Amino acid sequence: MKELVILTGHSGAGKSTAAGLLEDLGFFCIDNLPPEVVYQVASILSNNVDKLAIVLDIRSYLFGNIQNAIKDVKERYPFTKVLFLTAAKDTLIQRFAHTRRSHPLSKQTNSIGEAIELEFEIMKEIMEIADLVIDTTMLNPHQLRTKLTTFLEEKSEKTFVVHVISFGFKYGMPLDADFVFDARFFPNPFYINELRPKTGKDEEVKEFLRKIDGVSEYLNKIYELINIAISRYETEGRKEITVAIGCTGGKHRSVYFAEELGQMFLNKDYKVTIEHRDVELG
């Protein structure tokens, strides 16, 4: 089966890392193409290349109409997937300061902040039509690889995808979550010596939380609410939802809720991914 990915996004958001991961997954990667040759390059799929990734950065946008180029490619290759990487603006500024690299738009602006603002404005229409937008603000390369693999495994006739994330509030909320739920008002297993080193995936912690009044009801209410949202999302043509559940450190309560909620959606034959973002930190 032929696969074509157009990888784009904001400068500093991790396109080079993502391109390297795509190469590890067997993709032939070509980057920094002007719009007028994107369609021609895509045609190499007709030869001996089965998996092609075309990487476009802001410089490609400045050469012409990227949106039309992507439209032309999608008309010929309907299986084309557009992947857009972004990150919080403050994070992008920090990344450029750390690497001491100049922003591609730095000559057209007075500061790195202005360059990033301009880039967001130029790229906003492509971001809106992307098949998947990944916020890399809190992602490490392993987590990015997991998201890429999940994205590529989804078939055109795929069912709705439910992404469930557990996290610790003290490490910040996931910026790409559609819904965020708080589990901090339930008793914390952290304060029980024998449960402290364990996680919400361990049976002892599960048993402790199951016995707490309100836990089961809260879980069911979250499930009911997300089901309502999914039905509306599907009506609007959306194909995925990201649900985040947090506790203090992201090790016990949120992990338990994420695992239980993920299983509930698996039982409905949705495609489900479960990520425990901070379980090693909590």
Swiss-Prot record:
It holds the Pfam family RapZ-like_N. The lineage of its organism: Bacteria, Thermotogati, Thermotogota, Thermotogae, Thermotogales. GO terms for molecular function: ATP binding; GTP binding. Keywords: ATP-binding, GTP-binding, Nucleotide-binding. GTP binds at D57, I58, R59, S60. Displays ATPase and GTPase activities. ATP binds at G9, H10, S11, G12, A13, G14, K15, S16. Belongs to the RapZ-like family. PANTHER family: RNASE ADAPTER PROTEIN RAPZ. This is Nucleotide-binding protein Fnod_1159. The keyword Nucleotide-binding applies. The keyword Nucleotide-binding applies.
